[in-house]
A protein has these predicted regions:
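P-loop NTPase catalytic core
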Residues: 1-205
Length: 206
């Protein structure tokens, strides 16, 4: 059973109103000091049953004024096992999952044993190249000349965001890995992706 909670920011605002009416001393952002435990009581009801089945919880938190350090998203980040940070990408005009601000405490378990052996290396290479594109975009905005590599990372980032990070994308893990290999092959040389040669030999799109 999947439980979707929306919007936890509104819930916290309601807690703040009740707390103020009770003349309790507010904490950061006028939120009651009990916010952490109030949220934990809800989020930590997620459970996996020994006999099978689970109750996962997905909570939606709207950022107050776009501030990720606000008390609600800040406390949520400490309690939950991971967050998907959504933002609008102006380059492709879609809402995407931001890989830099998203977090998974389970990511270290991606070893390729339950998915595909190239999974961890493809994941790390894609994020590194996407970060290189962000640096190239900063250079361009500041009026610096771009190298050929910079231009290729920018083109890669647009396709990567459109084909993999956009929230309207619906692919399984194998399909995502194959699409990413296709983008690697389209924009880079094998040595630029910094992935083991045996994996490159197996998956590089000729």
């Amino acid at each position: 059973v999947l439980v979707l909670l929306t919007d936890m920011t509104s819930y916290a605002d309601a807690l703040a109103i009740v707390s103020n009416r009770m003349d309790q001393i507010p904490s950061k952002d006028s939120i009651p000091g009990s916010l952490y435990s109030d949220l934990a009581k809800i989020y930590e009801k997620a459970v996996q049953f020994p006999a099978g089945g689970s109750i996962p919880i997905i909570a939606v938190t709207t950022l107050s004024g776009g501030d990720i350090t606000h008390a609600v998203p800040d406390n949520t980040g400490y309690i939950t096992e991971g967050q998907l940070f959504l933002r609008r990408d102006s380059d492709i005009g879609k809402v995407i999952v931001d890989p830099f601000r998203s977090l998974s405490r389970l990511k270290q378990l991606v070893s390729g044993k339950k998915t595909r052996k190239d999974h961890p290396q493809v994941m790390n290479a894609a994020v590194r190249l996407y970060a290189d594109a962000a640096n190239a975009k900063t250079k361009m905005e500041n009026g610096f000349d771009l190298t050929n590599y910079d231009e290729r990372t920018l083109a890669f980032a647009k396709d990567y965001a459109n084909q993999l990070l956009a929230i309207d994308v619906n692919l399984d893990t194998t399909e995502m890995l194959d699409v990413t290999w296709g983008l690697f092959s389209k924009y880079f040389k094998p040595e630029e992706v910094n992935i083991k040669k045996e994996l490159v030999d197996e998956h590089w799109v000729k």
